Amino acid sequence: MSWLEKLLDKNNIINTRKTSIPEGVWTKCPSCEQVLYRIALKENLEVCPKCNHHMRMTARDRLDSFLDKEKQSEIACEYEPKDVLNFKDKKRYKERIALAQKSTGEKDALVAMKGELLGLPIVACAFEFSFMAGSMGSVVGAKFVEAVDIAIEENRGLVCFSACGGARMQESLMALMQMAKTSAALDHLSRVGLPYISVLTDQTFGGVSASIAMMGDINIGEPEARIGFAGRRVIEQTVREKLPDGFQQSEFLLEHGALDMIVERSDMRRKIGGLIAKLTNKSIQPEAE
């Protein structure tokens, strides 16, 4: 067979037709712009394997990867938000709730579970940032307080992963009241001698950062997480000064004493398990190889 016949052989003809790739198979790291296979990224706990950028996780993925398998059950799941003020901005609050519930599959912005961490009984909560920016309203407050109550009743440590834009403006003063309500519950937890570990993830701002996120016996930040009360731009416009580079990142807060430590996501189970074991004078079960 001549070279031309080989070239024209049907087995050697390259298919030039466009093929469609299902949406969501690939994604791009927002930090280094590396194209990543979505399934592999999820297995790596939403951490970029090239630059180690910690991306946001859903609340359920976070709790599922954090708690021991087959040792977890959801709690405080009966609450649903209500538009008691008939609030309307560009959309009605009822519409925003319905859209957020449809897009996330959650009733509100906090998921709470009880289970075990390396064999230690704990209660764990995680904010769902995709639900109205993880904003704290009356349902989030009620779920968190019930999680604290269960931790006290069953003698469990408490862990909370924060990712929040602040108090939910559509609930006005009722949202702001949750800062005092949740803080009082944590005071009760402290008085009975149970540990509370707070993990601040990207991003944690507003009323949550001014209450439950900073009230841990130990406050942990994820790498490069943005943490603060007001945003950088708002502060710069108010004080009319340029803020330092890295301002409001977890590394800056650690350097200035606002955080106790920074822990990578892959090491979170081991580190928090060890802390709770020391604070409760219990032994942990080692991770299976």
UniProtKB/Swiss-Prot annotation:
Source species, domain of life? Bacteria
- InterPro entries linked: AcCoA_carboxyl_beta (IPR034733), Acetyl_CoA_COase_Trfase_b_su (IPR000438), ClpP/crotonase-like_dom_sf (IPR029045), COA_CT_N (IPR011762), Znf-ACC (IPR041010)
| Pfam families attached to this UniProt entry | Carboxyl_trans, Zn_ribbon_ACC
Q: Name one GO cellular component term.
A: acetate CoA-transferase complex
Q: Describe the subunit structure.
A: Acetyl-CoA carboxylase is a heterohexamer composed of biotin carboxyl carrier protein (AccB), biotin carboxylase (AccC) and two subunits each of ACCase subunit alpha (AccA) and ACCase subunit beta (AccD).
Write down how the cofactor binds this protein: Binds 1 zinc ion per subunit.
Q: What species is given as this protein's source?
A: Vibrio campbellii (strain ATCC BAA-1116)
Q: What is this protein called?
A: Acetyl-coenzyme A carboxylase carboxyl transferase subunit beta 2
Q: What is the lineage of its organism?
A: Bacteria, Pseudomonadati, Pseudomonadota, Gammaproteobacteria, Vibrionales
Q: Where are the zinc fingers (C4-type)?
A: 29-51
GO aspect biological process, one term: malonyl-CoA biosynthetic process
Catalytic activity reads:
N(6)-carboxybiotinyl-L-lysyl-[protein] + acetyl-CoA = N(6)-biotinyl-L-lysyl-[protein] + malonyl-CoA
Pathway assignment: Lipid metabolism; malonyl-CoA biosynthesis; malonyl-CoA from acetyl-CoA: step 1/1
Group of enzyme by EC:
transferase
Supply the Gene3D superfamilies for this chain: 2-enoyl-CoA Hydratase, Chain A, domain 1
Q: What EC number(s) are associated with this protein in UniProt?
A: 2.1.3.15
Q: Which GO terms describe its molecular function?
A: acetyl-CoA carboxylase activity; ATP binding; carboxyl- or carbamoyltransferase activity; zinc ion binding
Q: Name the family.
A: Belongs to the AccD/PCCB family.
Q: Does the keyword Coiled coil apply?
A: no
- Chain residues that bind Zn(2+): C29, C32, C48, C51
Q: What does this protein do?
A: Component of the acetyl coenzyme A carboxylase (ACC) complex. Biotin carboxylase (BC) catalyzes the carboxylation of biotin on its carrier protein (BCCP) and then the CO(2) group is transferred by the transcarboxylase to acetyl-CoA to form malonyl-CoA.
Question: CoA carboxyltransferase N-terminal domain: from which residue to which, for each copy?
Answer: 25-289
Keywords from the named record: ATP-binding, Cytoplasm, Fatty acid biosynthesis, Fatty acid metabolism, Lipid biosynthesis, Lipid metabolism, Metal-binding, Nucleotide-binding, Transferase, Zinc, Zinc-finger
